[in-house]
């Protein structure tokens, strides 16, 4: 059975255009230009010419133009304008939350379709070719991969059949990172946050050809974060920044921090547009609200004269999603680090 997608749903087009218009005025990189090219060298040894040149994204707009564009999008969508601050080094105005942009869409309204089509729009209009989709769990990763598969023909018809590779980051195939960096076609990598958030991850380990991360960051990828409220710990935010993103586009129905909010489709909006059949509110507090912290103290025990150990039950995040588990903690332990999520 062949699935058909409606390419003309206005609310989805509005969400896509919101992200695209932030970069209005950006010159399109043509087929003879590789955009950002960075020569990769490790421990003083330069790689072969083919492997050494990272064909990456490049942004030519000034901070003033980005601020102007962002405020124009927000005004169009009746949202609060982003705060502006002064960069301490350049002494120029910049967006207070940097190049993080949020799109809020009610569950079930096609969020994944929107950001996959946004990839094609950014490629079509600006020539950007390197994209990384960061997800919080394997389950969501597999869902994104399936969406890439079933929409491929649909997007090929809309966007003149661009040559595109998409794949899941596999730590056993470190050559993927070099392929991502040096390939001059549209590249989409899907990766779980826990695959690169720790120093021990293969992504961050040195090899004879350098770290896989070094290849990726040389491209200044557009990073798309699915369910960013699950990635608000300092460790996870630092991991995303380590990718050296050109920008970070954040998609969720329940943002914890909607940095530079560009578009909002609330549950009421979705109901009014007949996108959902009804809205139900069972309780002010959800029984299983995994966006909130959960800590249950099970037992306290004393070790020696002064040391106290607590046995606590928490919701911890790993590459398989949220798992409820029991951990031992002492005074001063960082629960955010232990659980992999904001507490």
Show the residue positions of the predicted features.
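RecA-like P-loop NTPase motor core of helicase/translocase proteins
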Residues: 1-343
């Amino acid at each position: 059975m062949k699935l058909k997608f409606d390419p003309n749903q206005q609310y989805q087009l509005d969400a896509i255009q919101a992200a695209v218009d932030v970069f209005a005025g950006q010159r399109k990189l043509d087929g003879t230009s590789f955009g950002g090219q960075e020569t990769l060298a490790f421990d003083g040894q330069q790689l072969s010419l083919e492997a050494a040149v990272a064909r990456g994204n490049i942004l030519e707009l000034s901070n003033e133009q980005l601020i102007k564009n962002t405020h124009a999008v927000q005004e169009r969508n009746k949202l609060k304008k982003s705060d502006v601050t002064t960069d301490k080094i350049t002494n120029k105005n910049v967006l207070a939350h940097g190049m993080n942009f949020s799109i809020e869409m009610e569950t079930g309204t096609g969020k994944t379709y929107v950001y996959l089509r946004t990839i094609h729009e950014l490629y079509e209009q600006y020539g950007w070719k390197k994209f990384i989709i960061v997800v919080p769990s394997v389950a969501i990763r597999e869902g994104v991969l399936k969406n890439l598969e079933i929409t491929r023909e649909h997007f090929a018809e809309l966007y003149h059949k661009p040559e595109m590779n998409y794949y899941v980051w596999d730590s056993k195939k470190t050559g993927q990172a070099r392929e991502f960096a040096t390939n001059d076609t549209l590249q989409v990598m899907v990766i779980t946050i826990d695959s690169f958030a720790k120093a021990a991850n293969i992504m961050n380990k040195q090899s004879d050809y350098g770290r896989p991360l070094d290849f990726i960051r040389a491209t200044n990828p557009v990073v798309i974060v699915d369910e960013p409220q699950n990635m608000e710990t300092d460790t996870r935010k630092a991991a995303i920044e380590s990718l050296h993103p050109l920008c970070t586009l954040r998609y969720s129905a329940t943002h914890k921090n909607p940095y530079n909010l560009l578009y909002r489709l609330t549950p009421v909006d979705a109901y009014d547009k007949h996108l959902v059949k009804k809205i139900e509110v069972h309780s002010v507090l959800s029984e299983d609200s995994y966006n909130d912290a959960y800590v249950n103290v099970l037992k306290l025990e004393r070790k020696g004269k002064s040391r106290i150990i607590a046995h606590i039950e928490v919701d911890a995040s790993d590459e398989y999603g949220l798992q409820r588990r029991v951990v031992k903690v002492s005074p001063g332990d960082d629960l955010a680090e232990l659980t992999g999520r904001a507490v």
